[in-house]
């Protein structure tokens, strides 16, 4: 019976400690970023670089479409290209063996 009571108290202490630690994490404040434009941005309005690239700083637009184009979407900004860099050519030949003698 003593072991059961000990284990129950240990479990309760662990649960309580986890809950208290969780409250501490939730109480931290985060830095406030500038608000993202609701629908469109026009020249003369403030632009925060944290919103991403301002792909057309000369006309009003939303994230992808310029208002001056009307319903024509052929010149819309496609967004950032998320391809990784090509680090190695898989078809490249292996390097030649080192010249000279060796053990």
From Swiss-Prot:
Q: Which GO terms describe its biological process?
A: cell adhesion; pilus assembly
UniProt biased composition (Pro residues): 92-103
Which keywords label this protein?
Answer: Cell adhesion, Fimbrium, Signal, Virulence
Q: Which cysteines are joined by disulfide bonds?
A: none
Keyword Signal in the entry? The reply is yes
What range does the record give for the signal peptide?
1-30
Q: Where is this region: Disordered?
A: 61-103
The annotated regions of Basic and acidic residues compositional bias extend over 61-76
**Inducing or repressing factors:** Positively regulated by PhoP.
Where's it found, cell-wise? Answer: Fimbrium
Record's GO cellular component terms: pilus
Question: What residue intervals traverse the membrane?
Answer: none
The protein's job, in short, is:
Structural subunit of M.tuberculosis pili (MTP), which are thin (2- to 3-nm wide), flexible, coiled-coil, aggregative fibers. Has a strong affinity for laminin but lacks significant binding affinity for fibronectin or type IV collagen. Mediates adhesion to the extracellular matrix, an event that would facilitate direct interaction with the host epithelium during infection in the lung or other tissues.
Q: How does it assemble?
A: Forms a homomer composed of subunits assembled in a large structure.
Protein family membership: Belongs to the mycobacterial pilin family.
- In its UniProt entry, what is this protein called? Pilin
Origin organism is Mycobacterium tuberculosis (strain ATCC 25618 / H37Rv)
Highest classification ranks of the organism:
Bacteria, Bacillati, Actinomycetota, Actinomycetes, Mycobacteriales
């Amino acid at each position: 019976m003593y072991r059961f009571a000990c284990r129950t108290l240990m479990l309760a202490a662990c649960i309580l400690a986890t809950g208290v630690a969780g409250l501490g994490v939730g109480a931290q404040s985060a830095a406030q970023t500038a608000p993202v434009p609701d629908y469109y941005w026009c020249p003369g309005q403030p632009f925060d670089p944290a919103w991403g690239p301002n792909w057309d700083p000369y006309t009003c637009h939303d994230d992808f479409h310029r208002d001056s184009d009307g319903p024509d979407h052929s010149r819309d900004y496609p967004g950032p290209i998320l391809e990784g860099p090509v680090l190695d050519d898989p078809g490249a030949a292996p390097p030649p063996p080192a010249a000279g003698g060796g053990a």
